[in-house]
Amino acid sequence: MHNLETPRLKLGVFNPLDSLGQALIAAALHRQHEVSALLDDLNGITARPGLRCKLGSLESVETVKQAIAGLDAVFACLGGERQEDLPARCGCLIDGALALGDAGAPGLFLVGRWEWLVDSDDSGDEALGAGLRRSLDASGLDWTLVEMPPLAAGLRVDDFSGEATTIGSEARRALDCAEALLDELRLGLHRHQCLRLRGANGGRD
């Protein structure tokens, strides 16, 4: 039964097979949110109660628009993307959200490795990130960059089930990060900023 005191949100996760994506799904379902895994192969993920699967990728504006329509917030797990591909992927995400109009655009959480964007000493990195920063600043969207710590690869939703004392340390690390992201979604303390997740206990900066 749904806890009526908890707002039920419709959340989407791009790259849901990423370890953090799996942790987000587990944490969001535990909080009784409705979760959509956004991926280009609907057979690539195990069905479970409360989890929906929708076709979606960050390859084009139109596929993004169709995937995120009707969602309250979208988490794009970009840790596995090549740095040079990030501006294009993020551009499709931003433009897809803008195409839904002000009333329909979800909040965006761009989760990845952003040192090169926020603390760059390299002129090439600085030039690469300039367009992305302009796009984010000019979009008017509700967005948050999230700097994620290194996480173990290959974690799955079932790794996060059970009591806190029975979850492995690597799974606990990923789950703590996911819980911190869901707290940020609720509190909105880092809108239009870069949120740095620390590894231990999902700490935030």
Describe the function of each predicted region.
Residues H2-R31:
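N-terminal Rossmann NAD(P)H-binding glycine-rich loop of SDR-like oxidoreductase domains
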Residues E5-R8, F14-P16, R82, P106-G107, ...:
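Active-site-lining helix/loop region of Rossmann-like oxidoreductase modules
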Residues G12-V13, F109, T144-V146:
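Conserved beta-strand elements of the Class I
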Residues N43-D102, R186-L189:
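NAD(P)H-binding glycine-rich loop region in Rossmannoid oxidoreductase-like domains
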Residues G131-L155:
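Conserved beta-loop-beta element that borders a ligand/cofactor-binding pocket
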